Amino acid sequence: MSQPREPKFTNRRTVRIEWGDCDPAGIVYYPRYFAMLDAATQYLFEAAGWKKADLRRQFDIVGFPMVDTRAKFLVPSSFGDDIVIETRVTAIRNSSFDIEHRVYKPSPDGEILAIEATEVRVWAGPHPDDPKRLKARPLPEVVVRRLMGARDD
């Protein structure tokens, strides 16, 4: 197994909490956060230069499915709140990578950390023997470079 590399590339995006994100108690229903975090991972790749459709076409992959996730909910959010999701890759291995999400809420003193979450994702293409299955593939070097913060020259 290859040693994880330490990327530096980060993306931040603001998300408005909508009425449909909330439960009867008026706070965000936790599965909605996971949908927001999944979108944040896709926006990280967009910030690196690829929309998901471009990645699929250019590298002949199905996507980068999540194989593990965890979250620590520190401060709730409610309808109308604007949260900031900060996303970065924290480690890259041969065919998988780790994502860290930090969700912030505005406060009088700046921002407060509301959620800490992690994901493990696999770079996956169609299985050569069964198109209904996926097979992990090595991450292309250009993807690794961009996720580590390098730009193509």
List the predicted regions and their residue ranges.
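Short alpha-helix capping/helix-loop boundary micro-motifs
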Residues: 68-72
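Hot-dog-fold acyl-thioester-processing enzymes
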Residues: 2-66, 125-153
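Exposed loop/turn and edge beta-strand positions of beta-sandwich/beta-sheet ligand-binding modules
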Residues: 60, 67, 83, 97
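HotDog/MaoC-like acyl-thioester-processing domains
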Residues: 2-5, 73, 77-82, 90-153
